[in-house]
Amino acid sequence: MAAALLARASGPVRRALRPRAWRQLHTIYQSVELPETHQMLLQTCRDFAEKELFPIAAQVDKEHLFPAAQVKKMGGLGLLAMDVPEELGGAGLDYLAYAIAMEEISRGCASTGVIMSVNNSLYLGPILKFGSKEQKQKWVTPFTSGDKIGCFALSEPGNGSDAGAASTTARAEGDSWVLNGTKAWITNAWEASAAVVFASTDRALQNKGISAFLVPMPTPGLTLGKKEDKLGIRGSSTANLIFEDCRIPKDSILGEPGMGFKIAMQTLDMGRIGIASQALGIAQTALDCAVNYAENRMAFGAPLTKLQVIQFKLADMALALESARLLTWRAAMLKDNKKPFIKEAAMAKLAASEAATAISHQAIQILGGMGYVTEMPAERHYRDARITEIYEGTSEIQRLVIAGHLLRSYRS
């Protein structure tokens, strides 16, 4: 898969690299520049987004259209399984590479970005970390090429941020587990071929009684709720998963019984880097839109960019974007180097999501009336940005995570 990405590059960067360089990756960078491998990846993903995603983004949003052909092409490039080892069909890259690719794909189409994020971080991530060899062969390899994608079922109608309060149950019965309950707000639900599902196997133990399961889709006893009509990221389906005596094999449990809450929290820690990167892509394309418009819109005999008030807005937008990008890349590098990254991932997700909302808001202000109509993409960027402050941990949850780690460091 890494070779597929390599083949898309051209010029001196490609000639200077060999496939082996993809496996060397990075340690801690002493330079402000990205390694050549990552620069090449960035350009490859940018070219793909400009050719394949920018032209369809408005249609995807308007028609709630799942971009199946583009997702398939992304699978062929390794973008749906970026840190999955090559022997399992993945690209075998690192999390910094994933963050870079996620930003560029999301810059082209935010809906496609979240489809990519869920498959990489939330579906494949926990199986890679906690799955057995047999589970990886069954539940990872078929989900790397774009033929199949997965989803992650944690939230419920009665709990979102309170992830430990699962009311969905799984009881052991012979050689099976039987699931009952409803999971809510499941991204990719209507297109997914499998789900990582969290259910209580012992309610008396509260969050220590939650377990994780691998569930094929479709399967008897599992039905899908209606597709939610959302404000943004409308090309990615969101729906409930409804379990009614849904029977799955005993070996479908991921990890050990009672490990589900741990698996969920560690998965979300990784996923926040992906969502931060999605937010960066939305913020970048909103800034691009604002600058392009302001350079060409004449007012008082000159382009808008000659006005100090517009320059100040653009400067603030760029500052927020670049600051969030550095936080995101740092979190990814810490993870790649097996250093603690939970606080940094929360900071990245918080900074990037709030930057995306603020930047897309200011982009509309710069465009004025043109920012409020669908003729321009600014209003779509604003709608797409808003969810990044909500899913995979709200901004309030990120602040709790950051404060908790900060205070523990002072008290230790």
From Swiss-Prot:
Biological process terms in GO annotation: butyrate catabolic process; fatty acid beta-oxidation using acyl-CoA dehydrogenase
Transmembrane as UniProt keyword: no
Modified residues (N6-acetyllysine): K51, K72, K129, K208, K262, K306
InterPro entries: Acyl-CoA_DH_CS, Acyl-CoA_Oxase/DH_mid-dom, Acyl-CoA_Oxase/DH_mid-dom_sf, AcylCo_DH-like_C, AcylCo_DH/oxidase_C, AcylCoA_DH/ox_N, AcylCoA_DH/ox_N_sf, AcylCoA_DH/oxidase_NM_dom_sf
One GO term describing the cellular component: mitochondrial matrix
Active site location: E392 (proton acceptor)
UniProt subcellular location: Mitochondrion matrix
Keywords: Acetylation, FAD, Fatty acid metabolism, Flavoprotein, Lipid metabolism, Mitochondrion, Oxidoreductase, Phosphoprotein, Transit peptide
Pfam families xrefs: Acyl-CoA_dh_1, Acyl-CoA_dh_M, Acyl-CoA_dh_N
Pathway: Lipid metabolism; mitochondrial fatty acid beta-oxidation
Transit peptide: 1-24
Residues at which FAD binds: 152-161, 185-187, 297, 308, 365-369, 394-396
Catalytic reaction list: a short-chain 2,3-saturated fatty acyl-CoA + oxidized [electron-transfer flavoprotein] + H(+) = a short-chain (2E)-enoyl-CoA + reduced [electron-transfer flavoprotein]; butanoyl-CoA + oxidized [electron-transfer flavoprotein] + H(+) = (2E)-butenoyl-CoA + reduced [electron-transfer flavoprotein]; pentanoyl-CoA + oxidized [electron-transfer flavoprotein] + H(+) = (2E)-pentenoyl-CoA + reduced [electron-transfer flavoprotein]; hexanoyl-CoA + oxidized [electron-transfer flavoprotein] + H(+) = (2E)-hexenoyl-CoA + reduced [electron-transfer flavoprotein]
Main location: mitochondrion
Cofactor binding: number and manner: Binds 1 FAD per subunit.
Needed co-factor(s): FAD
Residue positions binding substrate: S161, D269, M270, G271, R272, G393
Known role: Short-chain specific acyl-CoA dehydrogenase is one of the acyl-CoA dehydrogenases that catalyze the first step of mitochondrial fatty acid beta-oxidation, an aerobic process breaking down fatty acids into acetyl-CoA and allowing the production of energy from fats.
Name listed for the protein in its UniProt record: Short-chain specific acyl-CoA dehydrogenase, mitochondrial
Organism encoding this protein: Pongo abelii (Sumatran orangutan)
Lineage, opening ranks: Eukaryota, Metazoa, Chordata, Craniata, Vertebrata
Gene: ACADS
